Amino acid sequence: MTPADLAELLRGTAAKVLDERGLDVSVLPETLTVERPRNPEHGDYATNVAMQVAKKVGTNPRELAGWLAEALTAAEGIDSADIAGPGFLNIRLAADAQGAIVAKILDEGAAFGSGHTLDGKRINLEFVSANPTGPIHLGGTRWAAVGDALGRILSTQGAAVTREYYFNDHGAQIDRFSRSLIAAAKGEPAPEDGYAGAYIADIAAQVQSQRPDVLELPAGEQQEVFRAIGVDLMFAHIKRTLHEFGVDFDVYFHENSLFESGAVEKAVETLKDSGNLFQEDGAWWLKSTDFGDDKDRVVIKSDGNAAYIAGDIAYFQDKRSRGFDLCIYMLGADHHGYIGRLKAAAAAFGDDPDTVEVLIGQMVNLVRDGVAVKMSKRAGTVITLDDLVEAIGVDASRYAMIRSSVDSSIDIDLELWTSTGNENPVYYVQYAHARLSAIARNAADLGIAVADPDFSLLVSEQEGDLIRTLGEYPRVVTSAANLREPHRIARYLEELAGAYHRFYGACRILPQGDEEVGPLHIARLALCDASRQVLSNGLALLGVSAPEQM
């Protein structure tokens, strides 16, 4: 019996108890929750439903808890239900009901943890979207890992997710990039507002290799060649780096296409016609304060050129025209102002602002021997995704980026993430999976088949703790999807690995010496198989490997 199964049983029991006493059943919450008590001696699960409902039906919480306890104790799969404090209920499952979680995991396999909370929802998930003017830095690396994991998690709940990269190939930064390439090709210092680093010289050399005559062209043509070829080369590098990091996109959307197709102009005219743009000092402004933004935003500047938000507005319209119900934007720490303006733009078009979600990620720092690492060998001024992977590997890089809430800044300690001890979170989790895989191999070598396990034999404290932890997995995945918080999966996996390691230390799994294989061995092997499955499922959601050996 999973926590969700127990919550469903609890609600049905509560409804019956209230109905039998002529009390109002409608006061019950649509969904009840059960929690694992901090002290396992208090039971397997606890609920405060009696305290939530008692006053609404005119009774005492402890009295209502007593009625519920009596009814629950008679239910199949419940060993006991005891009243605590002012009206809490502590519930203990029967051993076979608790073990049914293991059977469910083994039956569902890789699908265990999937749900239906987002069935039918079409979600556009835009992340990374780094400018094609340099390698991906640590902030973009964080979004690559978190965004990819979030896409996987949302998909498990039934959503149709499109991963999208917004290719910023329109604007002044591309001009600065091309001028930097020209300077490098000529052996001159980078422009004051340009880009530096060995990668600039590399790309400039590749442009010259493709167009040996480029420096002989007129200045305007010269810049256009460096711009076109240089951007293509840089973006190819970005795509390749992301692919090697385990991140691929369904759509690469070019910002420039919005201007070339007239989509920006059309969006602006639509807003003018709706009365949501006004003219002042020669510029056109979006009445974004009418829709909750902290100030009105310039859409068309007084010189007639489009402001950056004009492209954002047209881009949102394009996404909605493709049928997405929800557009999630994952942006850096310096983009807080985008939340209000994007929601205001949606509202100005008559859309529900809640069709826009903006997730803001905080800074990432790299630390070695307690000192921040600030310089990249290739990029010159910033640490890149390539630098991080070279230092600690793909798995550790992804896990380190995902395991903390995006609301918090993180320091990645190179020594910690390359260590092979329990203090390294990804090693701790992966080692649990490898140890479980070794047990499965050893069992196979001994000719032991896991058939018809008797889960009622799994009665030790460590077995119960491991089973209850396994049962939490679907709820954790659902929560991670609904809250857009992939770090919940990582933290859960660490908890599960801990529960498994404690079980491994306390319970002998395989027969030793001449000992015959008994029902308890079979039950424990089944528990091990279920644990390995859930660890594998969770690591897959994070895009981290589940090694068979370490």
From Swiss-Prot:
Among InterPro entries, the record links this protein to: aa-tRNA-synth_I_CS, Arg-tRNA-ligase, Arg-tRNA-synth_N, Arg-tRNA-synth_N_sf, ArgRS_core, DALR_anticod-bd, Rossmann-like_a/b/a_fold, tRNAsynth_Ia_anticodon-bd
An example of a Gene Ontology BP annotation on this entry? Answer: arginyl-tRNA aminoacylation
Task: Family membership, please give it.
Answer: Belongs to the class-I aminoacyl-tRNA synthetase family.
Q: Which PROSITE patterns match?
A: AA_TRNA_LIGASE_I
Cite the EC number: 6.1.1.19
| Descriptive protein name | Arginine--tRNA ligase
Q: Tell me where it resides.
A: Cytoplasm
Query: What's the subunit arrangement here?
Result: Monomer.
Tell me the GO molecular function terms: arginine-tRNA ligase activity; ATP binding
Q: Catalysed reaction per UniProt?
A: tRNA(Arg) + L-arginine + ATP = L-arginyl-tRNA(Arg) + AMP + diphosphate
Q: Where is this motif: 'HIGH' region?
A: 130-140
What's a GO cellular component annotated to this UniProt protein? cytoplasm
